[in-house]
């Protein structure tokens, strides 16, 4: 049985609001698709650079020098693999041969970021991970989370991270 109120609602949703029969369904499918696309791009914000022909200690030293050559000071170096090994549950199989995270900050960049939007304080300190994987300990990887390029400050942060990682990889190869 078709009620008058149901018919009115069906007409509003299918033709008046969206212009076609079943338009609402198409609208929501498109909306959900766009939501999934943007979620994928947000989740895929890690930049990884592989360093061949080096070892972990040399790559570590190259990373420290590359950060300091930008006039920045290291805030901390987190021994990530060791921390994970101490706190891991289960069988304890770790994917890393070695892994650490180097944190640093630029006061000028931090000030610019928070002037643009106070919540951007979450971008500081910047960090770059340095690691090898168990199955290939001769290949060192440098990785960082891209801050994106939606503001001028984020673009400068991305450029800084790119310069540091490229310089660190170059130093690691040259010194090995």
Where are these predicted regions, by residue range?
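Surface-exposed, polar helix/loop patches in the mature regions of secreted/periplasmic/lumenal proteins
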Residues: 105-156
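C-terminal partner/receptor-binding element of secreted or periplasmic proteins
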Residues: 142-176
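N-terminal secretory signal peptides that target proteins for export/translocation
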Residues: 1-24
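Terminal, regulation- and interaction-focused segments at domain boundaries
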Residues: 42-71, 76-78, 170, 174
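Short, ordered beta-strand-loop transition motifs
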Residues: 43, 78, 95-96, 133-136
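N-terminal signal peptide c-region/cleavage motif recognized by signal peptidases
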Residues: 38-40
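Sec-dependent N-terminal signal peptides
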Residues: 29-35
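Compact, glycine-rich, soluble single-domain proteins
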Residues: 79-123
């Amino acid at each position: 049985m078709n009620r008058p109120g149901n018919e009115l609602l069906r007409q509003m949703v299918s033709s008046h609001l969206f212009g076609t029969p079943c338009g609402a369904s198409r609208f929501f499918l498109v909306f959900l698709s766009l939501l999934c696309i943007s979620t994928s791009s947000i989740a895929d914000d890690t930049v990884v650079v592989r360093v061949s022909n080096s070892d972990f200690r040399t790559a570590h030293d190259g990373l420290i020098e590359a950060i300091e050559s930008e006039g920045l000071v290291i805030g901390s170096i987190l021994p990530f693999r060791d921390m994970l090994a101490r706190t891991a549950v289960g069988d304890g199989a770790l994917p890393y041969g070695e892994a650490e995270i180097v944190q640093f900050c630029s006061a000028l960049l931090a000030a610019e970021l928070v002037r643009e939007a106070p919540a951007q304080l979450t971008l500081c300190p910047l960090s770059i991970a340095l690691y090898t994987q168990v199955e290939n300990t001769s290949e060192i990887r440098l990785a960082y989370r891209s801050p994106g390029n939606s503001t001028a400050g984020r673009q400068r942060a991305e450029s800084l991270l790119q310069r540091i990682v490229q310089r660190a990889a170059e130093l690691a190869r040259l010194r090995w």
